[in-house]
Amino acid sequence: MKHLLDVNVLLAAIWQQHPDFPKADAWLAGRQVATCPLSELGFLRVSTAPKALNADMAASRQLLQAFLAKHKAEFIPADLPALKSSARKSDGVTDLYLAELASSKGMKLATFDTHIKHAAVQVIK
C-alpha cells in the first residue's frame, strides 16, 4: 500500500532535530510513499516560517528534493475539487482533503494526527 505523506510526516522525516524523526524514519523503511502540491508546499512553509524552523528556503527545497529522491516518492496532483471536501470545520479542511485525495488514488494518508476521522488515514505511532 502506498502512503501519501502529510506535512507533519514530511517535517518529522526530513528534519533530524524534529522530536518524531526516529519514529518517522523507522516507519518509512521499505514503504512506498507519495507527496502532492499541498504537502510539499506545507513542508516548505513550516520549514521556513520564522516562528517554526526558520530554515533557509534553498536548503529546505534541497532537503525535500533529496528525501523525495531517496524514497522514490510519487508525485500526485491535487486534482479533487476543493468544494467537494467533506470538511465541516475550518481546522479539518486540509486534513480531510488530503485523506480524500489519498483515497481517490488507492492510497492511505500517513499522519501523526489522531483527530482526522477518515477511512484512508493511517496514524503513525
Describe these PLM feature segments.
Residues 24-31, 102, 115-118:
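Alpha-helix C-terminal capping segments
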Residues 6, 36, 91-92, 113, ...:
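Histidine- and aromatic-rich ligand-binding microenvironments
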Residues 119-125:
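Active-site regions of enzymes building and remodeling cell-envelope glycoconjugates
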Residues 36-47:
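Short, conserved active-site loops that position catalytic residues or coordinate cofactors/metal ions
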Residues 8, 42, 96-97, 115:
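Active-site phosphate/pyrophosphate-handling residues
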Residues 1-35, 50-58, 62:
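Short, well-structured N-terminal submotif of metal-dependent ribonuclease cores
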Residues 12-14, 46, 119:
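Residues that scaffold the ATP/ADP-binding catalytic core of kinase and kinase-like folds
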Residues 70-114:
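Active-site neighborhoods of divalent-metal-dependent phosphate/nucleic-acid chemistry enzymes
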